[in-house]
Amino acid sequence: MPYVLVTCIPVWLVAAITGDSSYIKAIDKIWENIVGKKIYITGGIGARHAGEAFGDNYELPNLTAYNETCAAIGNVYMNYRLFLLHGDSKYFDVLERTLYNGLISGVSLDGGKFFYPNPLSCDGKYHFNADHTITRQPWFGCACCPSNISRFIPSLPGYVYAVKDNQVYVNLFLSNRAELKLNEKKVVLEQETGYPWNGDIRVKVAQGNLPFTMNIRIPGWVRGSVLPSDLYSYADDLKLGYRVLVNGEEVTGELRKGYLRIDRKWKKGDVVEVHFDMQPRVVKANEKVVADRGRVAVERGPIVYCAEWADNDFNIQNIILNRHPKFQVTEKPELLYGINEITTEVQALGFDAAGKLATRDVTLTLIPYYAWAHRGEGKMDVWLPVNRIDVE
């Protein structure tokens, strides 16, 4: 894990307890540097294997990315503590991106095998894992990642809501039932959702008749922000929207630190419905990220997608993505424990019978990044070429 995270943990605690502005400024500067220059689109951090370290600013290689699973968990911890310190949804935007991509990619879908690093590209040859493999393993000599992720997953319910005085923050969208205390009075919320596969969320007040403010996080990806920095941006012209209704009546208002505030006297049976527009988006990296020049990534909601060999009968690293691609989203409940698959038309490069370079139109299939490497060894890419010069 990048050791700056370990070093900063007591600093966050001291800053929160004492309110010392010098500590807070230092922490904020570290966070700004990470999110603005050193984080992967998957939320992974720590580019270098050597020293388990951050690299220079904008040093974000894909094939050799380290992105230790423990560092992703540390990134969640860091952003959660900074949310508690500042009350800003941007920290949960980073936390959510990390959770759904660069963190759970570190464990197999059946929970029995683990990655140490989490690269964004695989050529089927470079042995990136801690034991010089390219598949998840049941254990490692240094077993911090398996034990750390096994500890983290059961703690996830504690990140869904936050409470301060008479305010409830709805930070993550997961089906759940939660008992919360607001000034010693109990409120029970029930959340139903198909998120992250769709953007429909239903929060019901199952118990509690009292006034309080419900703060609904409106994710950055809905509002046109990949991350709260200029490290990544959307390369398409889509404008996503959202709607929030209370008992069937639409609620509007300005966002405060990324939250829509609903202040009212709540009663048992009240229902909040949230609808996020969720479509595939094309993402580009800052030009200073050399590894991603001439390439784009695809995401939908908080999920980053990748191309993997198992779904495509051509070399996925010899393709050209259209500059204005059209996407098809298909539910695949039987595939990889249930996913949404994305397809689009691309050009595959190869050689014709005369040995000349030629292209052919093919359908490219994309799967969620976290689900890769479950069907054998082979190639994978998150960042896809849009120029012939950038093809392998």
Go through each PLM region and give its residues:
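Well-ordered alpha-helical scaffold segments within catalytic/enzyme domains
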Residues: 6-21, 26, 59, 63, ...
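Carbohydrate-binding/catalytic loop surfaces
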Residues: 1-6, 44-68, 111-140
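Carboxylate/His-rich catalytic cores and anion/metal-binding grooves
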Residues: 22-37
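Amphipathic alpha-helical segments of tetratricopeptide repeats
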Residues: 16, 32-36, 84, 104
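Carbohydrate-binding surfaces of carbohydrate-active enzymes
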Residues: 83-92, 262
